Amino acid sequence: AELMERGETVYDINCVACHQTEGQGIAGIFPALAGSDIALYEKDKHIEILMEGVSGAAMNSFDYLSEVELAAVITYTRQAWGNAEKGDGEIVIPKDIVDYKEPKI
């Protein structure tokens, strides 16, 4: 519950302008997060997008956020707007972000 509250706050500050209050995005410009395959199922891809941004798109990297903030906002978007019921509802913990940052061998 605390992760969700923190995630909603991080979302409201960093994400809402493009992805909108209900995660619906803006058609043709900013993708919806509500019902998105990435938010429903692809946890690792979800982490990668926030860490790296999306080349050629308006989505910048948010790697300046703390591990806790990143885990919270990713969990929030995976749980909010009916996503938990439609998808795997998998939560992201700060360790997932730390693990992502580890050098890949």
Where are these predicted regions, by residue range?
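The canonical Cys-X-X-Cys-His
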Residues: 7-21, 73, 77
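A general structural signal marking secondary-structure boundaries and capping sites
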Residues: 22, 54, 80-84
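Gly/Gly-Pro-rich "capping" loops immediately C-terminal to redox-active cysteine motifs
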Residues: 24-64
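Flexible coil segments in periplasmic/lumen-exposed cytochrome c-class electron-transfer proteins
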Residues: 1, 63, 67-68, 72-105
